[in-house]
Amino acid sequence: MKGFSLIPFVLTQSPDGYLHVGADSTAVFGLYKDVFEEGIAEGVNNSNPLQDIFKPTKVDYKGGKGHTFEAHVGRNPSPMFVSEDGAFAGAGAQRHINGTVNVRKMMARLRLTQEAMDDSVSSEASWKSSKKDEMTRIIDDIAKREEFALSTDGKGVFCLLQGDPGTSSTTIEVDSPGNIAGSSFGNRFLQKGMFLAAINPASGTIRAGISKVVDVNEDGTDYTAAAVTDTDWADNDYLVQAANGSVTDTLDTAYNKAYHGLPSLIDDGTNWATYFEIQRSLAPSYKSYVVSSAGALATDAMQRTADVLYQKLGGEVTRLLMHPSVRREFLKLTEADRRYAPASSDRKQSDPGTVAFKKPGGDVSMGEVPVTPIRTLGLDQVYFLDENRMSAKQYVAEPGRFVDEDGSILVRDGVGDSARHAFEAWWFARKENFIGNPAVCARWDGVTGQTLVVVPEL
């Protein structure tokens, strides 16, 4: 009809059950699109402050039987004051010993199906290529494991079993993270998906059974296993990484294969009696000054340690390292002096804090020596470093790369009946950390008084 038009409308159902004219968000929901923020949010912590601070000289590892070093560890005892025509001491000799450094190895791998790679190539279909993402981020994961190694003693121990786990529960209690004695935060180095082997600490042999970590519990004291553990597992067994759930030999675990870290390099023989083939008990210059039960922090005790290093080999402390919880105890030492100190920007206001509040990962100082917090260090430790004289080195046979000797980084997964349309990439490195003069450094264990907040590192 002329002058008349039809206007379409939509009937929508209201909460009372009746249909009404008009469109609401429910009616047009099918038209809506997902709105995505730009980029991928980073949900893990990729900073490695200990590797940033502890920067050893890189040494090209030549192979063969390892790098042999010689050390002068004893004097000729014959110098003697004598009278005219008197007898004097018999001939003595200088004392030298040899040690040998061999590198250790770390490997990692990733797996991608053909579809995972193909369907993420286009920026229209994926935020990032899955191949690029996996191959880039695994380098961050490797660096994180190296940070763990530098904070521990080279045994590759994540933690110790706390008590007999029994066979009635999949909740496994642990303590002494990183094989550093302590009852708190035993699971701090565990990750979901890991396979764990139990090592008898007395013999170094593997216990029967492998445990898979399905959850790392937030209280810091335990982990949830995929199944109950073997009856062979016992209190204070070392828990180390195993290659898979079928491992029966220590060869296929990380036990005694990690790069050596500060607890074994700066040591008196407690953690590592034989230092690169040198018996520390026979060579005091390779024994660090270690206080096993330091107790509460005190400036006098810290000065005493600095004096010991100076008296022994002329050492001069250039840096202190400690966990943030221990650093908070250090800050308390000067709390009374700061309480009424004026803020630097406003003389009318007081500032009871320090620069550590503004930058928790930054340095404060002790006698102009930087005090650096390192989150992966032992929870009750302090390290006194003479960075100028300690002669820190890292022997490097391979700094790290993907295996490509057969002409390709990506290799087919499986053959025959086990073949899958997927590809793997393997990464490896061969290194070892070394300190040439450990006696100019010191370590405290057993610091007390700190309040530990259990915060799993992402």
Where are these regions (language model features)?
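Core alpha/beta structural scaffold of self-assembling particle/tube/pore-forming proteins
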Residues: K2-M80, G92-L458
